[in-house]
């Protein structure tokens, strides 16, 4: 099951989420849309196991990284049965 990993503009570029990910889903790339001028995108979300270690590792007050598990994503889109 694929999960959705969202990175928000509160990212400070500390790389804690990248280092916490056991499946190497995240990586830092340059980006002008966040405070740190870099962001951890999720190019391989199919490898995300939904452990949410990236969320736990994030030091910002408003989590900069958020994992939406498959069932959370479908429920929010009104697709759950």
Swiss-Prot record:
Its cofactor is [4Fe-4S] cluster. Signal peptide: none annotated. Binds 2 [4Fe-4S] clusters. Cluster 2 is most probably the spectroscopically characterized electron acceptor FA and cluster 1 is most probably FB. This is Photosystem I iron-sulfur center. The eukaryotic PSI reaction center is composed of at least 11 subunits. It is found in: Plastid, Chloroplast thylakoid membrane. One of its GO terms (cellular component) is photosystem I. GO terms for biological process: photosynthetic electron transport in photosystem I. Residues 2-31, 39-68 form the 4Fe-4S ferredoxin-type domain. [4Fe-4S] cluster 1 binds at residues 11, 14, 17, 58. Its EC number is 1.97.1.12. It is a peripheral membrane protein. The keyword Nucleus does not apply. The gene is psaC. Keywords: 4Fe-4S, Chloroplast, Electron transport, Iron, Iron-sulfur, Membrane, Metal-binding, Oxidoreductase, Photosynthesis, Photosystem I, Plastid, Repeat, Thylakoid, Transport. It comes from the Eukaryota. [4Fe-4S] cluster 2 binds at residues 21, 48, 51, 54. The keyword Thylakoid applies. Apoprotein for the two 4Fe-4S centers FA and FB of photosystem I (PSI); essential for photochemical activity. FB is the terminal electron acceptor of PSI, donating electrons to ferredoxin. The C-terminus interacts with PsaA/B/D and helps assemble the protein into the PSI complex. Required for binding of PsaD and PsaE to PSI. PSI is a plastocyanin-ferredoxin oxidoreductase, converting photonic excitation into a charge separation, which transfers an electron from the donor P700 chlorophyll pair to the spectroscopically characterized acceptors A0, A1, FX, FA and FB in turn. One of its GO terms (molecular function) is 4 iron, 4 sulfur cluster binding. InterPro entries: 4Fe4S_Fe-S-bd, 4Fe4S_Fe_S_CS, PSI_iron-sulfur_center, PSI_PsaC. It catalyses: reduced [plastocyanin] + hnu + oxidized [2Fe-2S]-[ferredoxin] = oxidized [plastocyanin] + reduced [2Fe-2S]-[ferredoxin]. HAMAP family: PSI_PsaC.
């Amino acid at each position: 099951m694929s999960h959705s990993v969202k990175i928000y503009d509160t990212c400070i570029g500390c790389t804690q989420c990248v280092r916490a990910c056991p499946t190497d889903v995240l990586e830092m790339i340059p980006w002008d849309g966040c405070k740190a001028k870099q962001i951890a995108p999720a190019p391989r979300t199919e490898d995300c196991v939904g452990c949410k270690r990236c969320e736990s590792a994030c030091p910002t007050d408003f989590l900069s990284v958020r994992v939406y598990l498959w069932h959370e994503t479908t429920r929010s889109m009104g697709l759950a049965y």
